[in-house]
Amino acid sequence: MTPLFAPVPHRLGLYPVVDSVEWVTRLLDAGVRTLQLRIKDKTDAEVETDIAAAIALGQRYHARLFINDYWRLAIKHQAYGVHLGQEDLETADPDAIRRAGLRLGVSTHDDMEIDVALAVRPSYIALGHVFPTQTKQMPSAPQGLAQLAAHVKRLGDYPTVAIGGISLERAPAVLETGVGSIAVVSAITQAPDWRGATQRLLELAGVGDE
């Protein structure tokens, strides 16, 4: 099966998920070329201001910037892509996202949710959470490396992203499963030396294919 939405490279490389325009700026300056803006707890006006600014930055750096959840604003400001959770799929309009030419990523946590994602045929499928994580309340147990590898094998050539509790130390084992990309949060944003952590993760995962 191939994506119905605009395609992404099979390898998106290092894929940080951050919550501010400041982090988007830092990481683009540091050489990251795939990232996601996940905004929480802001007013509608602040959300739109931040999304518009982040998208403009992404375009300036020719980066793959995904907007989490706010698909209407992503379309309005012409983002590279949108990332939706399973619950977001129920309220979003995937056809509108596809018609606008945006890429779509979808979160999954088990085989049933992978089935749901495949029915939509997004640009990539996120597989998580691999390890315990403190950055987001999760309703399910961690998958672990064996289950991640099984999902990657099932999906074959479909672009995949691993997410959830992936640290610098765990990243090599995650990449050995064959997953196309690794999404990280605290491995960068909570690192004592975020710039050094970013460079080491880029050395492991790369910036992604063109």
Curated annotation (Swiss-Prot):
Disulfide pairings: none
The residues the record assigns to binding 4-amino-2-methyl-5-(diphosphooxymethyl)pyrimidine are: Q36, L37, R38, I39, K40, N68, S107, K136
Instruction: Kindly list the GO CC terms recorded for this protein.
Output: cytoplasm
Reactions catalysed: 2-[(2R,5Z)-2-carboxy-4-methylthiazol-5(2H)-ylidene]ethyl phosphate + 4-amino-2-methyl-5-(diphosphooxymethyl)pyrimidine + 2 H(+) = thiamine phosphate + CO2 + diphosphate; 2-(2-carboxy-4-methylthiazol-5-yl)ethyl phosphate + 4-amino-2-methyl-5-(diphosphooxymethyl)pyrimidine + 2 H(+) = thiamine phosphate + CO2 + diphosphate; 4-methyl-5-(2-phosphooxyethyl)-thiazole + 4-amino-2-methyl-5-(diphosphooxymethyl)pyrimidine + H(+) = thiamine phosphate + diphosphate
Q: Which Pfam families match?
A: TMP-TENI (PF02581)
What does the protein in this record do? Condenses 4-methyl-5-(beta-hydroxyethyl)thiazole monophosphate (THZ-P) and 2-methyl-4-amino-5-hydroxymethyl pyrimidine pyrophosphate (HMP-PP) to form thiamine monophosphate (TMP).
Q: What is this protein called?
A: Thiamine-phosphate synthase
- Species of origin reads Cronobacter sakazakii (strain ATCC BAA-894)
